[in-house]
Structures are given as structure tokens and as C-alpha cells.
């Protein structure tokens, strides 16, 4: 059975031509995020606290303030909904005052492509996209340590199989001053989009 091992020492990781994915500055990125509660981060900033339970948090444990940042984005609304509400498979439009936000990065993002051959060449497997979160975070820490100037990771959602982005510290300067769109999930227009996404993946809408 294919397993995801712990990563080697960061200096053992290698890059070859074609291992990086480029996300152009005209690409629309989506994020579904809380605006109330603990450890809330505004839409255009990285989270410098962690690691949380999220798959690719690059911060060293134990959880706490860090000089390494992270933020997650998808290329479609359905993947945002699937990922954020996966525990209960129900979309709560009130708890945490969630917002749906879209923006275009201010420059091209250069990301390590975890959907190609890089994982297997470096001792991992495609499970780095879908495996146990603690092991994926160990790989994220090793990658971030090896290439601190890398903007982050290009990977696929374990829920939908669609592309996702984990942005690391170097990508912190790529948020524009204003979003293309940012509305609460309770907004009638946003609720319609989210309801359609929830129906598509079989989630309830609260």
C-alpha cells in the first residue's frame, strides 16, 4: 500500500525544470474565511500563527506565533465550500461571520507543483495532496525551510480534486489593496452562489 513517509532533511530536497507552477496575475483566486472568532485574519494577509489543523501549515509546532505565514486559496467557489465546511458537510452562513472573497494576485505566483513528479522523486507520493495532515505539514515545513523564497504550493483539493494554492511567506506581498469581490455568506447574492455549490457536492445549507 502506498504511504506518505516523513520528509528527508530539507537540504536533501531537489528541484528540476518543470517542478514549478506559475499562477499568472490575472488569475482569480477565491477564499472563504471567518471574520469573527479566534485567530481571525483579514482576507489580504497571511496567518502568522500555527500550525493549525490545516494541511500545509509551514509553522513549526507547537502552535503559536510564527515568522512563517500561510493562506489558502482555490480557483473555484465549490472547492472553497467543500474544504471549509468538510467536518459537518453543512454550510453555516452565520457562525464566524464567514465571507467569500475573490482577488487577483499583484504578480505571478511561483509555486512548487505537488501534482506532478516532484513528490515521488523526493521520496513522497501523490498522497502528499490527500494524506494525513500531520505528515503533509511536515513536508510543508521542509519545503518552506529549503526554499523560503518560494511563494507556496500548487496542489489538489482532497475534497474535490480541483486545484488549490497554499501561499507561504514570500507571497505575502501579492495581495492587492482591494478585492474583486468580498461579501458575507449571509448576503442574498453570495448565498445563492454558495447554495449552488453546496447542492453540487451534497452539503446542507444552514
Say what each PLM segment does:
Residues 77-91:
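Short active-site loop/helix that positions an aromatic residue
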Residues 67-73:
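A short, exposed loop/beta-hairpin motif centered on an aromatic-Gly-Thr core
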